[in-house]
Curated annotation (Swiss-Prot):
Record-linked HAMAP family: HypA_HybF (MF_00213)
Binding site for Ni(2+): 2
Protein name: Hydrogenase maturation factor HypA
Keyword presence, rRNA processing: no
Function: Involved in the maturation of [NiFe] hydrogenases. Required for nickel insertion into the metal center of the hydrogenase.
Presence of keyword Zinc: yes
Disulfide bond residue pairs: none
Family, similarity comment: Belongs to the HypA/HybF family.
Lineage of source species: Bacteria, Pseudomonadati, Gemmatimonadota, Gemmatimonadia, Gemmatimonadales
UniProt binding sites for Zn(2+): 73, 76, 90, 93
GO biological process: protein maturation; protein modification process
InterPro entries the UniProt entry points to: HypA/HybF
Keywords: Metal-binding, Nickel, Zinc
Name of encoding gene: hypA
Domain of life: Bacteria
Length: 141
């Protein structure tokens, strides 16, 4: 269950950002999780509650945005979303493609801190490499 270590990394990264902002607690952590990330959202939510206890994130909640899989199709010269993880073929022309453009994400995208303010993580200088993002294996064409 790697979700426990991922939850710990989320608490570490979000807690560090909250401290940098001078916040004493965090109310909400916003995540973007790709369908190919290998993360089970239910297990992550359970693990997060455990590791967030007795930290400035205790009692906070995770809001998870599900990121669908998208591939690039060379013949169509377009990016297409896929309906699932078991068929990496262009939904328009049926060409196989392993050129995955979305779906591996594991990103903290924002925080709501104790004063009600929201922070967009894209505007912050932060390192989320500890989260283990994009560790899904390459899917051959």
């Amino acid at each position: 269950m790697h979700e426990l270590s991922i939850a710990q990394s989320i608490v570490d990264v979000a807690g560090a950002e909250a401290r940098r902002l001078g916040a004493s607690s965090v109310r909400v952590v916003y995540l973007a999780i790709g369908r190919l990330s290998g993360i089970e959202p239910g297990a992550l939510l359970f693990s997060y509650e455990l590791v967030a206890a007795d930290t400035p994130l205790a009692g906070s909640r995770l809001v998870i945005e599900d990121i669908p899989i998208a591939i690039h199709c060379a013949p169509c010269a377009a990016i297409h979303e896929l309906p699932g993880v078991n068929r990496f073929r262009c939904p328009v022309c049926d060409t196989p493609s392993g050129d995955i453009r979305r779906g591996r994400e594991l990103d903290i995208t924002g925080l709501e801190i104790d004063d009600g303010a929201s922070t967009d993580f894209d505007s912050i200088d932060h390192d989320t490499s500890a989260l283990g993002a994009s560790q899904a294996p390459e899917i051959p064409a």
